[in-house]
Amino acid sequence: GIAESTKDQSSIGRFGIGFKSVYTFTDRPEIHSGEEDFTVENYVQPKRVIRTERADDETQIVLPLKPEDATAQDEITAGFKRLGPGALLFLRHIDEINWAVQGGGSGTYLRSSPVALGANVQRITVIGQESGQSEVDQNWLVFHRNVFTPGREQVGRVEVAFSLHPVKDRPGRWMVVPVAASPLVVFFPTAVETNLGFLVQGPYKTTPSRDNIPRHEPWNKHLVGQTAELLVEAMRWLRDNEMLDVSALRCLPLDREKFPEGSMFEPLFAASRRALLDEPLLPRFDGGYVAASRSKLARTQEL
């Protein structure tokens, strides 16, 4: 039935992502896929409908808008425009999104095949083009770590993604730069701001609306801990590849005021601070790296 899920633990649809939200705009969604053609009445009751013309591997979802909702089309169009190419960054089975509104705007978003740079690090490019707008081109450095239940069942991965900009006059070289905003991502952005200079993604348990997460849920705490360990691995990789510079350091959770004791992402602050103190991760003036506990900061005049 509609209420029964056969998806595995790591599936993006396990918690019904997106489906319940369609009832904001429709009372009778239709699904046409494979040999199935049905509508859903009263939220849970499937009813067979006439088969549509479509390719064998094509799925169609039809959402007849509520006739009394005069603002639905404008709201949906605004939602499409907010989507942006970044929506594809953490989706491993979707690499293209196209949308169009009759008599209105349109957009196309594409994700490149990831370029492997190490065992758990990739460079990913996403691009987007919307009607009347300049093309958007984003490059990301994405690190991942598989996560498991206490029974050792893999349930996806935690990821951290750093925004990349090309280094001027150095073809093929990239630098890490802080992002303007960093909402926690559970496949798609939530309303939870991380205060980080990079993006964090993982299979967090969310509220039914999927825009928030229970901060004291043990599973969510576990994922934050795994992300903290992954962040230190990323710092080491950036150092070894001569990318851990001042710009990259500005991405890290180093401001105690933003990560007070007991706050959700405080473990990332603690892990990065400990790593900087104990390991050679701080750039030296004369090249190379040194542990913060063994370094001195010169006055700005000398710098």
What is each stretch, according to the model?
Residues 1-42:
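Flexible ATP-lid and adjacent glycine-rich G1/G2 motifs of the Bergerat
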Residues 26-303:
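GHKL/Bergerat-fold ATPase module
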